[in-house]
Amino acid sequence: ELENVIHEQRRLIDAGLEALPKPEGPFQAAPRKCELIVGEWGNWHSSAFNARPALYQQCTMRDAVTTALTLDIFHRNTGDVRMACVAQSVNVLNSLFLTDGEHCILTPNYDVFDMYQVHQGAYTLGFEEKNKDPEVCIFASIKNDDIYVNLVNTSYSESKKIELKFKQCPEFVEAKTLYSKDPQNYNDARHPNRVRCKEG
């Protein structure tokens, strides 16, 4: 749904720019442009609106999956989306950090952002999907001849086997996984590493 909204808004912006009156006479007008910015995206659960402190929201493994899917949408649409701002970064809604007294807890969303930072400054890498599994979402990018691939398994009950084929055999460098048996698992002051990214 978000991807469709992005495309619709881009079309509306372009149509609006096209409808603006063109300058007359010998003067050249500066090129008209208008960037699309997505603000305050992320999961907003209804319980947060009654929370004290206000809008405090725990982030679960399920939230991490939707964060990864949303970032992949933005990455696929960099030609249309100039900037996207996560709802909040600390203590509120889809945050990366939660505080509890003297504790600062990294949420599963933090790990997603940490894993995805390799795509900064990279180019989207096109690929062909055969026998697509609707529960697996894939995004790839390339930077300085390094290829980065995201695989997001949206199934909470089933592992998936994915085969990647390259025209030339690449050297495998590393893999990171964010996983939890229970999609409702989260990190807190007593269990700060319940849901954390692991090598392999």
Each PLM stretch: what is its role?
Residues N150-V152:
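Short edge beta-strand/loop segments characteristic of extracellular beta-sandwich folds
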Residues E1-P23, R32-G39, N43-S46, T70:
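Extended catalytic-interface subdomain
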